[in-house]
């Protein structure tokens, strides 16, 4: 009798497993509906991004004085790397460097730096590495600093000549303008 019970249990377990296998295996696997490709929101303020030439698009975000310098270095590196790695021309590579937060001041020209360099130097905690004083020019426009700055001599002008475009933070620009106005008594 004991052998009969074990035999029936074994038979029932086997039939249960076989039934489950048939039920699961006989169903045709259906793939999920593919997700729609990502489509970013479009705003008229961003239309200029559609006009940026080049099929290999890169966006570099810089938010600090060091980051601004590194942005110039990285932009140059993208042109060099895409030329050597993919045989791409500079016109095939689209680079946008965004200067925001404390990197925004490096979007300002030498006239602004000459007049407000001391104030900006204090706000940014950034000094000329040669003089240890507040800069009176935009140091990212000079190739004379070499390894002393994170751009390693790659200037704003040199990456612009290669095709780099810049996005500059509106909020940070207004912040700097307000700080300069307050310091000037306005």
Question: What is each PLM-predicted segment?
Answer:
Residues 130-186:
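A cross-taxonomic marker for long C-terminal extensions/tails that follow the last structured domain
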Residues 25-55:
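C-terminal segment of N-terminal export signals and the immediately downstream linker at the start
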Residues 55, 91-95, 161-165:
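Loop/turn elements at helix/coil->beta-strand transitions in domains of secreted/extracellular proteins
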Residues 70-87:
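Histidine-anchored nucleotide/phosphate-binding helix
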Residues 88-112:
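Acidic helix-start/capping segments at beta-turn-to-alpha-helix junctions
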Residues 1-18:
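N-terminal secretory signal peptides and thylakoid transit peptides that target proteins
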């Amino acid at each position: 009798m004991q052998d009969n019970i074990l035999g029936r249990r074994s038979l029932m377990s086997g039939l249960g497993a076989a039934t489950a296998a048939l039920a699961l295996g006989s169903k045709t696997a259906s793939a999920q509906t593919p997700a729609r490709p990502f489509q970013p929101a479009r705003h008229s303020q961003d239309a200029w991004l559609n006009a940026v030439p080049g099929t290999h698009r890169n966006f570099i975000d810089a938010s600090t004085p060091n980051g601004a310098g590194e942005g110039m270095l990285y932009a140059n590196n993208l042109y060099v790397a895409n030329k050597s790695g993919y045989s791409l021309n500079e016109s095939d590579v689209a680079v946008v460097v965004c200067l925001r937060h404390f990197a925004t001041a490096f979007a300002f020209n030498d006239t602004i730096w000459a007049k407000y360099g001391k104030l900006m130097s204090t706000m940014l905690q950034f000094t000329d590495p040669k003089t240890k004083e507040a800069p009176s020019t935009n140091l990212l426009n000079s190739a004379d600093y070499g390894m002393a700055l994170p751009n390693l001599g790659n200037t704003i002008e040199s990456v612009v000549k290669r095709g780099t475009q810049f996005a500059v933070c509106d909020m940070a620009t207004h912040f700097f303008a307000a700080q300069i106005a307050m310091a000037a008594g306005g």
